[in-house]
């Protein structure tokens, strides 16, 4: 049985615009709508999740702040960060012989990042108590990927943000994901110049995600 997955490369687009498109897609889809992945980068923006607390926004400066409907706390998006939004019909999994829970979807996102980074020689890992993906460098734990999902009508939207080759300075203006003092890192910290490129990393990320969840008809 073919289990299709449509992958869309959106380039660099405004956060609010893509957010509205995700909501519209989720509201309008039906049981026959193929699942989709949207690969995108955003201009600089801070986003507050539904659990976001204002005290974690320390000094936004000129960077806009958006109150989002995803789960989680505050994070930063900017050019050089690969966003992968996953628009998945979770409840349809049983029809394909798969029982996908929200926790399994989160795990699939985390493991797709872990496997992708392993291909670059980076040893990364998830944490059960703090969703996302982390790297231990010289005894210090740093976060390289943040996660946030919303489930509506049994379908997911939002997804992950993997730091590839970006300006990490704005993360110092917040408590990332609600953790004071949490240091962020990116793929460019661990590889040679030129290897940390969103266009090179994103197909690997999608391939691992599709394999983990059993998609066998991925269309870019």
Swiss-Prot record:
Q: What is its EC number?
A: 2.3.1.181
Q: Where is the catalytic site?
A: 177
Q: Mind listing the GO molecular function terms for this protein? A: lipoyl(octanoyl) transferase activity
CDD domains named among the record's database cross-references: LipB
List the PROSITE patterns hit by this protein, alphabetically.
BPL_LPL_CATALYTIC, LIPB
Give any Gene Ontology cellular component.
cytoplasm
Sorted alphabetically, which InterPro entries does this protein's record hold?
A: aa-tRNA-synth_II/BPL/LPL, BPL_LPL_catalytic, Octanoyltransferase, Octanoyltransferase_CS
Site: Lowers pKa of active site Cys. Where? 143
Q: Which Pfam families match?
A: LplA-B_cat
- Where the record annotates domain BPL/LPL catalytic, the positions are 31-217
Keywords per UniProt: Acyltransferase, Cytoplasm, Transferase
Per the record, the major location class is: cytoplasm
Q: Which catalysed reactions does the entry list for this protein? A: octanoyl-[ACP] + L-lysyl-[protein] = N(6)-octanoyl-L-lysyl-[protein] + holo-[ACP] + H(+)
User: Which pathway?
Assistant: Protein modification; protein lipoylation via endogenous pathway; protein N(6)-(lipoyl)lysine from octanoyl-[acyl-carrier-protein]: step 1/2
**Residues the record lists as binding substrate:** 70-77, 146-148, 159-161
Q: Which GO terms describe its biological process?
A: protein modification process
Compartment(s) where it occurs, according to its Swiss-Prot or TrEMBL record:
Cytoplasm
Q: Which family does it belong to?
A: Belongs to the LipB family.
Query: What is the protein's known function?
Result: Catalyzes the transfer of endogenously produced octanoic acid from octanoyl-acyl-carrier-protein onto the lipoyl domains of lipoate-dependent enzymes. Lipoyl-ACP can also act as a substrate although octanoyl-ACP is likely to be the physiological substrate.
Quote the record's miscellaneous comment: In the reaction, the free carboxyl group of octanoic acid is attached via an amide linkage to the epsilon-amino group of a specific lysine residue of lipoyl domains of lipoate-dependent enzymes.
- What protein name does the entry list? Octanoyltransferase
Organism listed in the record: Actinobacillus succinogenes (strain ATCC 55618 / DSM 22257 / CCUG 43843 / 130Z)
């Amino acid at each position: 049985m073919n289990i299709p997955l449509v992958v869309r490369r959106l380039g660099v687009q405004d956060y609010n615009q893509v957010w509205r498109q995700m909501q519209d897609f989720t509201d309008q889809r039906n049981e026959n709508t193929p699942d989709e992945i949207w690969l995108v980068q955003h201009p600089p923006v801070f986003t507050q999740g539904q659990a976001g607390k204002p005290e974690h926004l320390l000094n936004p400066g000129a960077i806009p702040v958006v109150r989002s409907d995803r789960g989680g706390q505050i994070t930063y998006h900017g050019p050089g960060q690969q966003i992968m939004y996953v628009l998945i019909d979770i409840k349809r999994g049983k029809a394909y012989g798969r029982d996908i829970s929200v926790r399994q979807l989160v795990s699939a996102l985390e493991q797709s990042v872990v496997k992708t980074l392993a291909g670059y020689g980076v040893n990364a890992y998830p944490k059960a108590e703090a969703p996302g993906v982390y790297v231990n460098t010289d005894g210090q734990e740093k976060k390289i990927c943040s996660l946030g999902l919303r489930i509506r009508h049994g379908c997911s939207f939002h997804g992950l943000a993997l730091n590839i080759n970006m300006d990490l300075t704005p993360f110092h203006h917040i408590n990332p994901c609600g953790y004071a003092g949490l240091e962020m890192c990116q793929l460019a910290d661990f590889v040679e110049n030129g290897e940390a490129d969103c266009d090179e990393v994103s197909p690997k990320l999608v391939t691992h995600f599709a394999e983990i969840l059993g998609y066998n008809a991925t269309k870019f």
